[in-house]
Amino acid sequence: MAGAMRKMAVYLGLVEDDGYDGRGFDPDDDFEPELDPEPERDRRRHEPPHQSHQALHPQRDESVRVVQPPMQRDPVPHSASLPAESVRPARIAPVASITQERQSLEKNAPVIMPKVVSEREPYRITTLHPRTYNEARTIGEHFREGTPVIMNLTEMDDTDAKRLVDFAAGLVFGLHGSIERVTQKVFLLSPANVDVTAEDKARIAEGGFFNQS
């Protein structure tokens, strides 16, 4: 209210306006006292630099998240994880020792000789002329010694001849030999270890051995 009355007094010239600065006065304008900028500038001039900087740029109250890099583990050397035996270089045997060892093995190895088939052993065929069955013992002894026997039964009767043939068949069977009929009453008894040739069998058939005893 006092301000309005002062404005009116100034307008009527009753009161001198101390703050008149030569500008036009409009009674309708709201009167706002002007602040002197000088004290503010003086205050800023005397303030320390960091305070003025803080006043101009206020510090933001924000939490800054610091991201720490992950911890790095020290690399483990490869040589530490490997056993000592694997790190050692392989020993290479000298060529000379390998050659000597091979020669020693070849020398000690048994030598396998090929089996040589021996030539047919010579044999002598015995011709017997039994007259009775009692001579069967003589036939058995020659045959058991490995001698081929020509059994000529032409001088025996049929009954004794038949009995002697049965004996010869049993003898050959027991000693793993063979019996062959040459003629009606002539038989060849061959031991297991003797192979009578075809030429000798032909001669027997022709009667070449009949006279041997």
UniProtKB/Swiss-Prot annotation:
Any one of the GO CC terms: cytoplasm
Disordered: annotated segments: 16-63
Keyword line: Cell cycle, Cell division, Cytoplasm, Septation
Compositional bias segments (type: Acidic residues): 27-39
Domain of life: Bacteria
Pfam family, one: SepF
Biological process terms in GO annotation: division septum assembly; FtsZ-dependent cytokinesis
Similarity field: Belongs to the SepF family.
PANTHER family linked: CELL DIVISION PROTEIN SEPF (PTHR35798:SF1)
Protein name: Cell division protein SepF 2
